[in-house]
Regions:
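S-adenosylmethionine/decaboxylated-SAM
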Residues: 1-132
Length: 132
């Protein structure tokens, strides 16, 4: 979601720093949905945080970079941490390349092809998989 990438929301650019910053939007959404007591945002570089993550995850939401390296790195770093029966949601999954970037679709297919996950549900471009 960085400035200059094919897919980013220019409204998320911090006016002071000029950098993308979705944290205020996340906080507003957690407040609106009364999820502050069950969702704990961890702020940091995805790969650095994954390296130090020790526990299982019951719900993983991948909505990161749309380039091949960031998307596959997120999948490789986090998918194995989802507990059996847990969920992995991937945003911006578009089977038709004309509709959006391919890497989120590629990691979606990879998760199914590797046999670690099964399709659970979908809503628009959001695909939710369940860990086997």
């Amino acid at each position: 979601m960085q400035r200059g990438w094919a897919h980013h929301d220019s409204e998320l650019v911090n006016r002071d720093s000029g950098l993308m910053d979705s944290l205020p939007e996340l906080r507003r959404n957690l407040e609106k949905t009364s999820l502050n007591d069950v969702v704990v945002p961890i702020i940091g570089d995805s790969l650095v945080v994954a390296r130090h993550w020790a526990g299982d995850i019951s719900m993983l939401f991948i909505d990161g970079g749309h380039g091949p390296v960031p998307a596959h790195s997120d999948y490789e770093s986090w998918a194995s941490k989802v507990t059996r029966g847990g969920f992995m949601a991937i945003h911006d999954v578009f089977p038709n390349p004309a509709d959006g970037g391919r890497p989120p679709y590629e990691i979606y297919c990879r998760a199914l092809d590797e046999g670690l996950f099964e399709q659970h549900s979908s809503l628009g471009s959001l695909q939710v998989l369940r860990r086997l």
